[in-house]
């Protein structure tokens, strides 16, 4: 079923997506004893906390930032470590454990959500915050439905931790997040 989900997610993404690396990661996780559990939105508790773990594409740190951090010997953390740091950061900020992970978009982000959920031994929610991709935060299904993304937790490639606890609207969440992504 997971293989089918990852293949279908690549079809849904409508871009050049090779599901095989994601399938390999999921199979390795299963071999190492990880369990995958998916729950329906109907089974999600009203007081539960769900987190979408995602990256910010369309750029990245400015070249001089990359050069400087290399000269400082700063280590770039693996995505898996940063993804789990985001979940810990939001959980710590809210004072509650995260109940489930939700995928942020199709393609590789589906595998990311599955792996974070399995690593934490929590379910993935059978849903997503976008249909295909996340061009910008204010174009996500939750915001269109009146659900804000605040608070937002961000972990930089080097492990800096940032919480956006208040923003005027999702447009500002997008602006602030993009500014952090290039810093």
Regions found by a protein language model. Give the residues of each.
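Non-transmembrane, aqueous-exposed alpha-helical and coiled segments at domain scale
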Residues: 1-183
